[in-house]
Amino acid sequence: LFASTRNQETGREEMTTTVSKPNIIPSRRNFLKGAAALGGSAAMLAAVNDGARADGDPIPVGQASPLTDFAAADGVEFKNGLTLACEEINALGGILGRPLEPYFEDTKQMGDATNVQAVQRLIDRHAVHAVINGYNIGSGAAIQDVIADSGIIYVHYDTTIGHNNLVKSDTARYFGSFQGDPAEYWYGPGFLKFVQQLEQAGSYKRANNKMAVILSAGVYAANIANAVKERAADFGWEISLFETVNVPISEWGPTLAKIRQDPPAVICITHFLPADLAQFMVQFAPNPTNSLVYMQYGPSIPAFREIAKDASKGVVYATVVGALQDEIGTAFEQRYKAKFGENAGHNSGAQPYDGCYVWATAAALAGGTGEPGNDAQNRKVADRMRAMIWRGVAGTTRFIPGEQAAYTYPTQTNDPSLGMPHQFLQIQDPAKSGLLIAPAPYDTAKFMLPPWMKA
């Protein structure tokens, strides 16, 4: 139950959350049966709770997300994902009988200063024991200092190598900061390897050796684009266009003119906002080049297909973190859409959902959570998180020692049980979500030659 309250000092509306207590679970057997229905490793948390009812003192958990402004389509789903996780965990007994109580702060247009202020408010106003975020645009290495100063746990999905480097620089200080997915760097070599596999399977034949790379200003898109650029020659590619565009962008004419003047075999776009990418396809479709079009993350958001419509058919996109189209992922999608609506973006919601389960299970195994300032208890929680191999909605979460970011499969580890799958999907029906075409063993469909391409 969400209620709006007015802060007496600032006069602004704030969202607070009240969690209703779940029913007592009648027996340990039924309790574990209920946990198994959730899939993943939820039964582990259920077993540790040992049939407890979540009627103890609530544990405040926070999230700082872009609930308004240009990334709100994702921010709302991040909120939904944490909300659903808290409700399910509470139905399993919370954390050793204490229910989770989520609080949310808006990061709006994001950026380091805004992101840090939002997290600081969660700590100062609500004394949260953990912050479980989706992504926030920024350096990816600023919130960690607020977390370190407060001694709590932080799980985020900023997908940035900046996190890995920061934690590596001082593992003792940043003990509580975890990136729940792999760094963005892996999008680069992972994409090149994916195209190579399409060629080896005979599913795609390059028209030439040219690849156009289009990026937006910002560390995230630049890191991916540079990773592609650095490794392209290893896979026989020549970067024929490497162009940075200012975003948000709705007019792609100048960029498309360059592409049409010197048509590449592959168009690789490392920008990720769905509305911008949809406009690219709308403007590309009337006069397409014989190019495989790859986009980064954005097409996984329903808004992309809603805007691009038929022009979206054939687009290939990827995410290093998203709900798998398997038994666990499909069951999550059904629960998620039953609660938040058929058009809800469960792939975004899956991020803090998994992150919350990882933290909550580790906390239960460690004997409970720690409030701000209780570094000693939260170090025990962090130790448990580092030691876990968690099978969740997005696949396997296993943290790299000394970096505390998730391993990626198959580029970083060739064992799907030890790394989070770098998923490649393709929109084959604009009325439906993309189909998972790689990697094995998670793929559910075959690559389809886009309708604008020549066989």
Annotate each language-model stretch with its function:
Residues 7, 11, 16-21, 27-34, ...:
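Extracytosolic ligand-binding ectodomains
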